[in-house]
Regions:
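Secretory/organelle targeting and membrane-embedding segments
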Residues: 1-153, 157-496
Length: 496
């Protein structure tokens, strides 16, 4: 799509929270420092805590120093950015706040030429979404005022199919779908975007991207950290809700989708939805065949002893919450019929890593060995984080007088090739929202399909009669039962 730079105002509701401090303002600063943020712009922070505009600016200065990818080169540059920051205190449940926000926006817009473009960011707990959406509608702030008006909503988008539909209904009563941006920061990561370029801009890969050549796909999102201070939240969520429903299913759809007509929001969302429709529904009677859950116990991470999940603050001593989840999904269409997609995510794993591994079939006839098992099949690994890049393994002759084969890797690393670290995901996604490009956001129907797919698993795990989650040692790659889970197809989990 064509991008034009116009003035805009961003209102961050929940500006005193961690998301604003660690991600949003650092991303906005990095965009400004890189001269990619449209100007003139204004950023209005709002939260319950009382603070002056100067106090807010000082806090954001400390935030940028600590968390931004790009550090302020000089006070002059920072001062120019800070002059666009302001603060409006208030309770998001109080209609009076929205009158104050309207007045602040009108003052900013009246002092500069150009349309009144407004972007609202819900950086609050999801429990406040309904209240905020309702107040934005009742106050008239949701209606465009001579420019565009948009809203960004953070995950989780509900906690099941019913609540997701309710949230979409609340949003739809106030905003049009093209005004709504449901953010999944994984889609803003450089390597995730490069997945589509890899597929559709290189003729060597797309002909192999099907059941005739691909034996299996593994998608891993592992975290070395535990629940930290989020024990109470995690008790209500769990790994399946927190990570699988959004991040991993989005990655699956990007990997499995057909080529869109153009790389624009509508065609891309349509193709991702076709994948969701093609995923084989989960039979409630066969949950154990397609899903497995685990929970971390005590262990060692980087040589330090750590407590198990049930010993974390805010967690019930008899909790059955999943901190590890694995799925085996099948995509029943012409391209992927019979190819298993294995998805796994967990906390307190051996290390922090996110990757997609595409394992290809073995050669149909190995002429170099009588036993073809001596040569590993080709594998393409797309590393999402850390150390963004790609690696392709191929068979090659090892040096020496005898004909012996070994596996070698062709490795591409972003930092080495481009000489700079990739931008943070929020930088790309915030800029896309300003430019009206929702390609890397989630659409309402996709969100509901994802919850509908996982509903049988969530229902089964919620039953009192359900088995306890399998325990795994903190610092490991998950429960031992997960290896039996994948070995039923003759496979094995990769060790990233």
């Amino acid at each position: 799509m064509t991008r034009t730079d116009e003035p805009f105002a961003l209102v961050i509701l929940g500006a005193s929270g961690d998301l604003t401090r660690r991600k949003l303002v650092p991303a906005l600063w990095s965009l400004y420092a890189g001269r990619t943020l449209p100007e003139p712009f204004a950023i209005i922070g709002s939260a319950r805590s009382e603070a002056s505009a100067d106090e807010f600016r000082r806090r954001m200065r400390a935030t940028v120093r600590e968390f931004a990818r790009v550090k302020p080169p000089s006070e002059n540059v920072w001062d120019r950015f800070a002059s666009a920051l302001s603060y409006v205190p208030g309770d998001p449940a109080d209609p009076a706040l929205y009158a104050k926000l309207e007045a602040a926006l009108r003052e900013i817009e009246g002092a500069r030429p150009g349309p009144a473009n407004r972007l609202f960011y819900c950086a609050t707990p999801p429990s406040l979404y309904e209240t905020i959406i309702g107040n934005l509608g009742a106050s008239g702030l949701a209606r465009p005022q001579g420019g565009w008006t948009r809203i960004i909503v953070e995950k989780p988008f509900g906690r099941d199919h019913e609540s997701a539909r309710a949230l979409n209904s609340q949003l739809g009563a106030v905003f049009r779908e093209e005004q709504i941006y449901r953010i999944d920061h994984y889609l803003g990561k450089e390597t995730v975007q490069n997945l589509l370029v890899l597929r559709f801009a290189n003729t060597i890969f797309e002909p192999l991207w099907n059941r005739n050549h691909v034996a299996e796909v593994q998608i891993t999102v592992a975290e070395a950290l535990g629940v930290e201070t989020r024990g109470a939240y995690y008790e209500e969520a769990g790994a399946l809700r927190d990570m699988m429903q959004n991040h991993l299913l989005q990655l699956l759809c990007l990997l499995a989708m057909e080529p869109p007509v153009t790389f624009d929001a509508g065609p891309v969302h349509d193709e991702k939805n076709k994948v969701m429709h093609a995923i084989r529904p989960i039979d409630p009677r066969k949950i154990d065949e397609v899903a497995l859950r685990g929970q971390y116990g005590p262990g060692f991470v980087e040589g330090k002893a750590v407590v198990g999940y049930r010993g974390e603050k805010g967690v019930a001593p008899d909790s059955r919450t999943d901190t590890y989840a694995a799925l085996r999904l099948l995509v029943d269409n012409w391209r992927w019929a019979g190819v298993p997609f294995y998805l796994r995510t967990g906390k307190r794993m051996a290390k922090r890593v996110s990757e997609i591994a595409i394992r290809f079939h073995r050669t149909p006839h190995m002429i170099f060995h009588r036993d073809p098992s001596g040569v590993e099949p080709n594998e393409l690994v797309i590393r999402i984080q850390p150390d963004e890049g790609m690696a392709l393994t191929v068979a090659a002759k090892t040096p020496g007088p005898e004909l012996k084969l070994g596996t070698v890797g062709l490795d591409f690393r972003y930092g080495e090739v481009f000489g700079a670290e990739p931008p943070e995901a929020y930088e790309r996604l915030l800029l896309d929202a300003v430019h009206g490009d929702s390609t890397l956001y989630a659409r309402a129907d996709w969100v509901e399909h994802a919850w509908s797919l996982l509903g049988p698993v969530l229902d089964a795990w919620a039953q009192d009669s359900a088995a306890q989650p399998y325990l795994y040692e903190a610092g490991s790659w998950g429960p031992a039962e997960a290896y039996a889970f994948i070995s039923r197809d003759g496979g094995a989990w990769r060790k990233p």
